Every structure is written in structure tokens, then in C-alpha cells.
Amino acid sequence: AAADEGTPIYIYAATNPENDICSLDSLTKAGISAYIGNGNKRNYRNMARYVRQHIDAKRLFVTPAEEAVESASDVLYHLDEDLSFKTVADYEKYLREQGIYREKAPKIAIVGGLNDPFSGNRANIDSLIVSLQNAGMNVYPVSSYRQRLTFLREIGPDAVIHFAHGRMVMGQADAAVEWLKKRNIPIFSPLSMLETQEEWESDPMGMFGGFMSQSIVVPELDGAIY
């Protein structure tokens, strides 16, 4: 109904043909897709500016939008969301320069498919990094889909924390399990909630459907500890 009345609509990553709706022209759709597809605070900010100028057609007090920038992938990261590291060596060099690295301290790797560290919504990740560092550990947060197992092998962690949404290493699940067995280390899988703790605890169901299977059932195949 809104589209019929002329309201610009674009449903990104539609789940089925019935809700695959777009009333934008191809150039505008491509621009919006570039911002969303590389979700980070800079791109979201510029998407809002783009919408205001090119879709809402505002003319006064307009700040032109910058081009979308590609989000980092297959990298290690830390508390500064503007920094990322392509190699473990570069990451450890950074930790040493910051006076954070501890020689011979336990190594904790953090991986996950549900938490994007570059999206601007990462308070839970940052608090975990700081807490583990304050406990005397070296923390290795990894943002990677294709190279996750490669990073883990190079890091050689004493434990893995997996913010699960599926298997720890998609496409290499059996190899990942064998690697865990060989190293004989635990994999912890804290639950990521899309609501407040109070709302979750008061909900009799707690989790449901695909979210439950991807966060609890499937990770158990990797030996996840909750």
C-alpha cells in the first residue's frame, strides 16, 4: 500500500519473492545496497545522508554523502573499530606497541558469525575483550568467514569463544572439530540475545525456530560449552 502511494521502498535481502519489493530506480538501489552491504557506522551515516538528499529530495542543509567504503573482512581486530589486521604477526605487534601483550600468557580466540565488530554495535564484544585482558590473557578477536580456521591454527589458542550462528567453521566443520580435538581445548559458546536480559528471562520460550537451532543445537556438533 505504501509503495502504491509513492513511498520509496526497498527490502534488502528479501527472504522470499513475495517480499522482494523495490520501488527505487536501479542506480539508487545500487547506492543503498553498497551502504548496507558494507555495514559500518561510517556507511550507515552516509546512507542516511544519501537518503535525505537523493530519495527524500531535501535541498536545504544537506551534507553530501561519501561513497560507501568496503568493510574489513578476514582480519583480526581490537577495541579501535577503525583498525584491523590482516595477519596475526601484525596484530601481536600492535598489542606490544600498546603495552597489552603478555609473554607466555594464555591465548583466547574470539570468533563468531552473529556479531559484526564493524557495525557499531559491539559493546558486548568490547567488554569481553577488556575483561579477558584484565584477567591476564592475550585476546585474539577474529572477523572472518573464509579464513577462520587458518587464523585459529596460526594463533594456537588455549580456548575459543564462539558467538555462534551455525558451525564454528562453515564449510570446514569436520576439519575444525579435528583441530579442536588435536589441541584438546574448550570452545565456549555464549548466547547472543536480540533483546534485553530481562525480556529474555521473562519469556517462557526463550529462543525459537532457526535462531535456537543455529545458536544452540548446531554449535553442539562442535562441542560447544554454554
Predicted region positions:
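An N-terminal assembly and electron-transfer interface module characteristic of large anaerobic redox
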Residues: 1-226
